[in-house]
Amino acid sequence: MGEDAAQAEKFQHPNTDMLQEKPSNPSPMPSSTPSPSLNLGSTEEAIRDNSQVNAVTVHTLLDKLVNMLDAVRENQHNMEQRQINLEGSVKGIQNDLTKLSKYQASTSNTVSKLLEKSRKVSAHTRAVRERLEKQCVQVKRLENNHAQLLRRNHFKVLIFQEESEIPASVFVKEPVPSTAEGKELADENKSLEETLHNVDLSSDDELPGDEEALEDSAEEKMEESRAEKIKRSSLKKVDSLKKAFSRQNIEKKMNKLGTKIVSVERREKIKKSLTPNHQKASSGKSSPFKVSPLSFGRKKIREGESSAENETKLEEQVQDDHEEGSFTEGLSEASLPSGLLEGSAEDAEKSALRGNNSGVGSNADLTIEEDEEEESVALQQAQQVRYESGYMLNSKEMEESSEKHVQAAVLHVDQTA
């Protein structure tokens, strides 16, 4: 740029140089005078030369300016590209920084977790150390106690008797035992407990720690022995129940019941003893069948008999009447439906109560009056029952009984003292 400016100055001031050169030329010819025509021609040429020089300089300057502008444009374009590259690199750096921040957060979380775990582990290690220290102390105590026991040569032997069985008399419940029997049972229980207890064969010179340990073991064994006692007692109770409900016991009970059943000879006697005079017709409305009434005999007192004998005879008669009533009830229950059995049971209870009252009471007159309709219905039902059971009376006896029962039946019982 400085060179271009210097050249432009040179082109602008060529006249000055020419003027300086021209005065030097006319000096050798001082006598000659310049002509005006020559001066005019020279000035025109100089002007032309100056104009040409100026145009060239301007053209060159313009070219240089264009070149300079092109260079500036290229430089700007390069700068723009560099700026774009810088922006991309800056963005990459920012992304890398965000990733680094994320990694740092994750690492901080992991580090915090590791710190928490290390704290927990340290707490566990402390607890384990404390436990180990306590165990070491206990082991040292046990070693000392063991050494002392070995020095003294005293041992405690625990004997557990598994084979000793409990007698069955302990579990059998007797009805209201006396004081002596209660004492004997208490002594037996004490002896059993003593046999089941542990046997102490050591002296009392041992340390309290050993005694506590041995007492704990003894209590555990006692609890085991109690559980075994309960098991044995339950098994024995089950065996006793099985024996109670065995076939032999059931057969014995059935035999006892069979002896109570009325035999064939007794039935024949009951047939003969039945008379229509002493039959009592139950109400036809309440019960549909007839129950045999109680028979009250009237006997005279002989001279050699006492009142006690008369009472025994009356009781025997009452028992016979009860047996007859039970026999007739059984026959009626076998033949009639279950709906009719309720009336028979009620009539049997009423007749039994009347019989007992008649045997116990003193001089009493029992009067039984019944309607004709009720008696006829009762007689018909009694005939049906006896026909079904195979114990029918003869037609003549039934006619006589019907004729006698049409009238009101009155029974007088006189008990002599």
UniProtKB/Swiss-Prot annotation:
Residues 274-286, 354-365 have a biased composition (Polar residues). GO terms for biological process: plasma membrane tubulation. The keyword ATP-binding does not apply. Residues 62-100 are annotated as: Leucine-zipper. Residues 219-242, 302-320 have a biased composition (Basic and acidic residues). Residues 2-168 are annotated as: Interaction with CAVIN1. InterPro entries: Cavin_fam. One of its GO terms (molecular function) is phosphatidylserine binding. Keywords: Acetylation, Coiled coil, Cytoplasm, Lipid-binding, Membrane, Phosphoprotein. The modification Phosphotyrosine is found at residue 387. It comes from the Eukaryota. The modification Phosphoserine is found at residues 27, 35, 37, 51, 202-203, 217, 282-283, 286-287, 292, 295, 326, 335, 358, 362, 389, 395. Component of the CAVIN complex composed of CAVIN1, CAVIN2, CAVIN3 and CAVIN. Interacts with CAVIN4; this augments the transactivation of NPPA by CAVIN4. Binds to PRKCA in the presence of phosphatidylserine. Interacts with CAVIN1 and CAV3. This is Caveolae-associated protein 2.
